[in-house]
A protein has these predicted regions:
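Polar, glycine-rich mid-to-C-terminal structural blocks
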Residues: 467, 479, 484-549
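Conserved functional hotspot residues or short segments at active or partner-binding sites
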Residues: 176-187, 523-524, 528-707, 711, ...
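Extended, small/polar residue-biased N-terminal targeting/export presequences
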Residues: 56-142, 186, 193-248, 309-311, ...
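Bacterial N-terminal signal peptides
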Residues: 8-16
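PDZ/PDZ-like domain segments forming the peptide/carboxylate-binding groove
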Residues: 70-71, 92, 111-122, 132-166, ...
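Cleft-lining beta-strand/loop regions that shape enzyme active-site pockets
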Residues: 20-31, 44-57, 61, 194-201, ...
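Bacterial N-terminal signal peptides that target proteins for export
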Residues: 1-7
């Protein structure tokens, strides 16, 4: 798992904050004894109990080292060929080293990686002191994953010269002046350089162990103590904190969003853009300065026990660096991560003179409060319980049909996938599992009657994986609803969490956890969702790249296979209506300007993906930019007569968002970044609207052909 700047939904962002550069070489990191013990224990488990047991030998050692190097330097910007030769000389030693609890090999690789970061970025900053000649005809290979490693330091420096030149040209084309470009890039490289001084031993171990785990199979992972805690939080949808999305921006931990109903929002004392410069515990605890501190460390200080006090030293959003601070006290409380929970909306779809109400339920994850369920908490949170409540509300609002939006739902609890399917098909088998011994077990739901028997559709994309695929596949096999969108991810494997500390009887978290593949999913029709995923009944275009995203993009994915079909009876026959549904969809989108724009965007993106080299000549790049602007202007004129202004505004916003400003996310203003995200969401709505129209067609056809609808044998609506 590579360390990246990324948001952890609703409460924190785990990214690396930049600060004023430290002098001297980066710290030399060394493994701790407990890490070596955890690696040894993990190896024992993975070789004995994994669904695909792979011995830790010389062959696997070579794969692990290669994957580890790739995770550190995927685009080959930092190491040179001599470094790689040095690393691969250790290929046959890693397995023995792990069993002897010796992690010097991965740590020595990482320490050289830190050294190379400092060398390359120091050189990049030096290049900013000079200008560049953009009249020259030269190209830059900006996608380098398949390129050879630089053969020498001179070749590496020339690569970085082109990289900096391209960064400069992008800002220049966006209208930035030379000094502003120097300032922006100087800060960018300084921030990147500062990260080399902030890595910890735990970071190195996490990256290495993930390289080891994923070398066996793509969905096997190692989670250190911090990562394991975050995984537990994401599944429970709750934690104790202040209720704020935090993000690193220009050395500060910045409030990006306030969670409705959380302590931060209810206090009325915090606003989006406020910067946290200090954290103190309790009413009298000493204030700790957190400027320049890694954001995950800041989050650890803000989290705490329920009903305890945390004090924050705040630099207001509208204050300058020397502005007046304010000190606020907040009482920590249990925060529900509502933005990951199921939500409903109602879309009104017109079809000729008829108007239909489509209830849309968006489910980002199959979450479940495992502890709450085990303890018998009557109000524990889970995806199926929340969706059941939303279905009851939609029925009261008299919707004609229900659309389950599972786009980018990466899965979660298997139990929840089964229970959620039961809400729509009633009692019966949902999914089959085969373990490492070859035993096949059928998982089903015993709900006496479905919660919704009306028209149903499921919207999926390439990001719909695991539990999402179980649900979509079962709905498809039962003939219960129409599956719409892109082909799904193709993750048909079952993982379990192995707590290494519990196995070792440790009193405190020390060794972390393994997420280990132990079984494989199969549809009730006998085929697996592994590798091939779920093929939609009605396909919609999407931005995903199957060559780089999805199960088929992994070089060591488990193959597709098949078992005997389960004993089940379809409850409907939506397939019988698919030709008519497809025909209506095709006719409609031919006249839908917004949908046509979306298809053009997808085609353009696919063409750009094939482009791995870009010109560093200013005239050539301006010509490309002018062609793009001309295309967008022509599109705007063509759509000027559209009656649906809302959809047109969404498309225009998406177009605007694609204009290259040469900036990285944390270099834009917070308001600009949030506006860009809103525009991206608007682009997604084009597909959602069409999916709702497809479901509207389905409703009409089911009403005219009731024999294809869900039969009452499964019970009446609850």
């Amino acid at each position: 798992m590579r360390l990246k700047n990324s948001l952890l939904c609703v409460i924190l962002a785990i990214s690396t904050a930049a600060h004023a550069l430290e002098s001297g070489p980066p710290p030399v990191l060394s493994p701790m004894q407990q890490q070596a013990q955890a690696a040894h224990l993990s190896a024992q488990f993975l070789t004995r109990f994994h669904y695909k047991p792979v011995p830790l030998d010389d062959t696997l050692s070579a794969k692990v080292i290669n994957r580890y190097i790739k995770s550190l330097d995927p685009e080959k910007f930092f190491f040179v060929q001599a470094d790689i030769d040095q690393f691969t000389a250790e290929n046959t030693k890693l397995d023995d080293a792990i069993y002897h609890e010796d992690l010097r090999i991965p740590f020595s690789i990482f320490n050289l990686y830190q050294q190379r970061i400092v060398e390359r970025l120091t050189y990049a900053r030096e290049l900013l002191k000079q200008g560049f000649d953009f009249s020259q005809k030269e190209d830059y290979s900006f996608v380098r994953d398949k390129e050879p490693w630089p053969k020498s330091e001179a070749e590496s420096r020339d690569l970085w010269r082109k990289r900096v030149k391209n960064d400069w040209l992008r800002l220049k084309l966006a209208g930035k002046k030379d000094q502003a470009i120097r300032d922006t890039l100087g800060k960018r490289y300084e921030n990147s350089l500062a990260r080399a001084y902030k890595y910890k031993s735990d970071d190195v171990f996490q990256i290495f162990m993930n390289a080891y785990a994923t070398s066996i199979e793509p969905h096997t992972d190692y989670l250190g103590t911090s990562a394991a805690a975050d995984f537990d939080i994401s599944m429970k949808l709750s934690l104790v904190g202040i209720g704020a999305v935090l993000q690193e921006r220009d050395d500060y931990t910045t409030i990006r969003e306030l969670v409705a109903g959380g302590p931060a929002q209810l206090s009325g004392k915090l606003a989006v853009g406020d910067r946290i410069v200090g954290v103190a515990q309790g009413d009298k605890g000493a204030m700790t300065d957190v400027v320049g501190t890694r954001i995950d460390d800041v989050v650890k200080q803000i989290r705490g026990a329920k009903d305890t006090v945390v004090r924050l030293d705040i630099l207001p959003a509208d204050a300058g660096p020397d502005g007046k601070h304010k000190l606020i006290s907040l009482v920590r409380n249990k925060i529900s991560l509502e933005q990951q929970a199921a939500k409903k909306t109602i879309l009104t779809i017109k079809n000729g003179d008829a108007t239909r109400k489509v209830g849309v339920i968006t489910l980002p994850a199959f979450y479940e409060d495992f502890d709450g369920r085990r303890k018998g908490d009557k109000n524990f949170r889970s995806a199926s319980r929340d969706v059941a409540a939303l279905l009851a509300e939609l029925k009261k609002e008299k919707v004609d049909s229900v659309l389950m939006d599972l786009r980018n739902n990466g899965g979660g609890s298997l139990t929840e996938a089964v229970d959620l399917t039961g809400l729509f098909v009633g009692k019966g088998p949902i999914v089959q599992q085969r373990n490492a011994r070859g035993d096949v077990n059928v998982e089903g739901d015993d709900i006496p009657a479905p919660a919704w028997t009306g028209p149903l559709a499921v919207l999926i994309n390439r990001g719909s994986a695991s539990a999402s695929e179980i649900f979509a596949a079962a709905i498809q096999d039962y003939g219960r609803g129409v599956i719409i969108g892109e082909g799904s991810f193709g993750k048909g494997t079952v993982q379990t969490m192995v707590n290494l500390d519990e196995l070792s009887h440790n009193d405190k978290p020390k060794f972390g956890e393994l997420k280990m593949t132990i079984a494989q999913f199969f549809r009730i029709n006998g085929g697996t969702t592994q590798l091939r995923g779920v093929t939609p009944d009605i396909s919609l275009p999407g931005f995903s790249d199957p060559e780089s995203f999805g199960e088929s993009s992994y070089d060591n994915a488990l193959p597709w296979s098949q078992v005997k079909a389960a004993d089940y009876t379809p409850v409907g026959d939506v397939k019988g209506l698919l030709p008519q549904i497809q025909s209506r969809h095709d006719t409609r989108v031919e006249k839908d300007k917004d949908f046509q724009r979306f298809q053009e965007d997808v085609a353009e993106l696919n063409a750009l993906r094939k482009k791995r080299v870009i010109s560093l000549n200013e005239t050539d790049r301006r010509n490309e930019m002018n062609q793009q602007e001309a295309r967008l202007k022509a599109r705007g004129k063509a759509g000027a007569g559209d009656s649906d202004s809302k959809d047109k505004d969404a498309a225009d916003a998406a177009d605007l968002n694609r204009q290259d400003d040469g900036l990285q996310a944390n270099e834009r203003s917070l308001s600009a970044e949030l506006a860009a995200e809103k525009a991206q969401k608007s682009a997604k709505d084009v597909l959602l609207n069409e999916a709702a129209k497809i479901l509207g067609d389905t409703s009409d056809l089911l009403k005219a052909n009731p024999k294809f609808a869900m039969q009452p044998a499964s019970g009446k609506d609850k």
